[in-house]
């Protein structure tokens, strides 16, 4: 990778490169990229980076997105809603969550229930 500016298509398991490419608008020299297509659900102002220890979106950073993308937004709002435009577009295959409450399979609340059926025998929601 060239300093985080390239996307490795071999690990693009969510199809992020095409989503990001659509969101990039031509920019003038010195301007930050515009992510109009990928705007977060809320237009609420973000706290300053220093006040919350903000280093960018952890989801995009973990997926080795470009620095300009992962520093342009936060993963979640203070109330827990997902702000990351990339993650908001993902639908969990286990529970169908997306948008404000989107998550990957790794963080799906159903994952623990599905892995340990013995502890779920008293859970009426999981009975057939």
Curated annotation (Swiss-Prot):
The keyword RNA-binding applies. One of its GO terms (biological process) is negative regulation of translation. Zn(2+) 2 binds at residues 92, 95, 103, 108. It is found in: Cytoplasm; Cytoplasm, Perinuclear region. One of its GO terms (molecular function) is mRNA binding. Ovary and testis. A motif (C2HC 1) lies at residues 57-84. Keywords: Cytoplasm, Metal-binding, Repressor, RNA-binding, Translation regulation, Zinc, Zinc-finger. It holds the Pfam family zf-nanos. Zn(2+) 1 binds at residues 57, 60, 73, 84. A zinc finger (Nanos-type) spans 56-110. The Nanos-type zinc finger is composed of two C2HC motifs, each motif binding one molecule of zinc. It is essential for the translation repression activity of the protein. Interacts with ccnb1. PANTHER family: NANOS PROTEIN. This is Nanos homolog 1. It comes from Xenopus laevis.
């Amino acid at each position: 990778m060239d300093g985080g500016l390239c996307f490795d298509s071999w690990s693009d398991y969510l199809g992020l490169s095409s989503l990001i490419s659509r969101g990039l608008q031509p920019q003038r020299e010195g301007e930050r990229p515009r992510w109009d297509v990928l705007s977060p659900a809320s237009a609420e102002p973000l706290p300053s980076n220093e006040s919350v220890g903000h280093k960018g979106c952890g989801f995009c950073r973990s997926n080795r997105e470009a620095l300009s993308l992962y520093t342009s937004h936060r993963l979640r709002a203070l109330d827990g809603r997902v702000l990351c435009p990339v993650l908001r577009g993902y639908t969990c295959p286990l529970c169908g969550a997306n948008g404000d409450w989107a998550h990957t399979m790794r963080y799906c609340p159903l994952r623990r229930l599905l892995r340990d059926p013995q502890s779920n025998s008293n859970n009426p929601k999981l009975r057939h």
